[in-house]
């Protein structure tokens, strides 16, 4: 079956950069890690009918972070719709494609950065605010792996090829398939890596990108367009955060960007 997407083109406004506050002496991270492996029962959360992939990524990230660091909390379908409606205020999940429901003009997807700004300023439907968020240089795999090792999760924005739908259905890693057209923009949760692949969750299943996809470019557009770390309250005080993040640099960059002081207390 064809699945839905829903990531709008990135707006690329100023944002924190993870590489600037990554500690100069980065703690050694394992050659491979799969933070997703301990969890099963991932849910579709509406992305088979509506373009809510970005809201689903929020729910999946909150589940992974809480399950790893505290007590698991998987946001509900109702909460996913609530977050989706922050950028689609007229959307009604019970509506139809000819009115205001899935597939209608009120089902317009989300911009990743705008969603992260909302989570930082207001908090998600689960009542938790993001402490901060930052862009990761997805072209630097060492930085990508360091981000995953420190935070256990990446919010990714990608372009999906038509061929990737078939690879997903067959349980194969996603690759850059020559000649396959771009099918849509998608937001997903990255949650692990090997020497060659990045692991992720989409459409309720764990799969992975082959290196050819990660480095792929189609018609001048990178297949991986966005990668973000989100600092949640659960990260504060953890050994990985304390050793991997230059907190003084993070605070300075945050103040330079926003004009406000960053609070890093639990």
Report residues per predicted region.
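Catalytic-core signature of thiol
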Residues: 1-266
